[in-house]
Regions:
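PAPS-dependent sulfotransferase catalytic domain
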Residues: 124-259
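Short, high-confidence coil segments that cap the C-terminus of an alpha-helix
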Residues: 2, 119-122, 147
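Acidic-histidine catalytic/liganding microenvironments
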Residues: 25-26, 225, 293
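Glycine-rich phosphate-binding loop used to anchor ATP phosphates in small-molecule kinases
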Residues: 105, 109-137
Length: 314
């Protein structure tokens, strides 16, 4: 039986690919869609920010392309099954631009109610570190349940900050896995990414971002126990397949998940499965991308970095 789990990390540390690999594996033709036609979410991605989001777009294609949003806010969705106290708090604050990290007044019961419902409906949750107060409330809620924690850790903070602010411009946060049936969709996203003309990155914003990452790098170290596993970015996203594969096995063994079954790996085989989600083809910020940053030289000089250091997978 799979242990319920939390995937948690700073943004740009690989949480989306890890979540995607588990979601895709756990979905089957029998459980892919709920009775209301909404796609199931074995791993619920960033529920607290999503809870407060509002997307008011009349184009039906927009709704169809947002399965996670539909899971939460669609007809008979996750939001409708939350206790009234949380719905009453959340509904007036929903907005396209809501950021939960800016709302320190979010009460503990919102975190508790979301976790209680998700624990019964989802195998896991993916969350992003959003500050000390946010993490305290999240962990206070999850500690009441039998979760295992997968902490993805990345040390190249400048690379993370640059990747984040580039993605804010072109809005490509992750390449889809290299499924044969996904080829056209995947290529469209890659082309959008390749053809985008980046504007200069704000060095002051990068400074603030790196400072936040530096400050929070030890945020979980004092509370880790046997229910935590720390996964280094350089191992899961290694340039060598064997290290990536063995690291992925370490994760799935920790949560009692069998990736060798054809039901999970969709007859691709476990090695191919890992390559599809963590191979070089999944990297958004590859070395050549840095050359597209108009003020790259100024950034490197300001942070006393070399391009080789920026490209290190650590």
């Amino acid at each position: 039986m799979i242990n319920n789990f939390i995937i948690i990390s700073e943004a740009r540390s690989g949480t989306t690919s890890l979540t995607g690999s588990i979601n895709s594996g756990l979905r089957t033709p029998e459980n892919r869609f709920w009775s209301n036609g909404i796609e199931s979410q074995p791993v619920l991605g960033e529920p607290f920010t999503l809870l407060f989001k509002r997307i008011d777009d009349p184009d039906p294609s927009v709704a169809r392309n947002r399965p996670l949003y539909n899971y939460v806010h669609g007809e008979n969705g996750f939001f409708t099954r939350l206790p009234e106290r949380t719905k009453k708090f959340v509904e007036p604050k929903r907005s396209p631009k809501f950021k939960i990290e800016d709302r320190h007044d979010t009460p503990q019961y919102v975190f508790d109610d979301v976790i209680d419902l998700s624990y019964t409906e989802n195998n896991g949750i993916k969350e992003i570190v959003r500050g000390e107060s946010y993490c305290e409330k999240l962990l206070s809620a999850t500690s009441r349940c039998d979760y295992r924690y997968i902490h993805l850790r990345r040390h190249n903070h400048l690379a993370m900050a640059i990747s984040f602010w580039m993605s804010k411009q072109h809005n490509v946060w992750n390449f889809p896995a290299n499924w044969p049936q996904n080829k056209k969709f995947r290529q469209n996203i890659i082309n959008k990414f390749k053809d985008f003309d980046l504007e200069p990155l704000d060095i002051t914003e990068l400074e603030r971002h790196v400072a936040r990452l530096d400050k929070r790098k030890e945020i979980f170290e004092d509370i880790k126990n046997e229910n935590w596993i720390t996964i280094e970015f350089k191992d899961l996203y290694s340039s060598g397949h064997e290290l990536s594969y063995n690291t992925y096995l370490k994760i799935v063994d920790f949560i009692n998940l069998d990736i060798h079954s054809e039901t999970f790996n969709k007859c691709q085989g476990s090695h191919t499965w890992v390559d599809m989600f963590f191979g070089n083809g999944k990297r958004v910020t590859q070395n050549c991308v840095y050359d597209k940053i108009p003020n790259l030289k100024e950034i490197l000089s300001h942070f006393d970095y070399t391009k080789e250091q920026l490209s290190e997978r650590i």
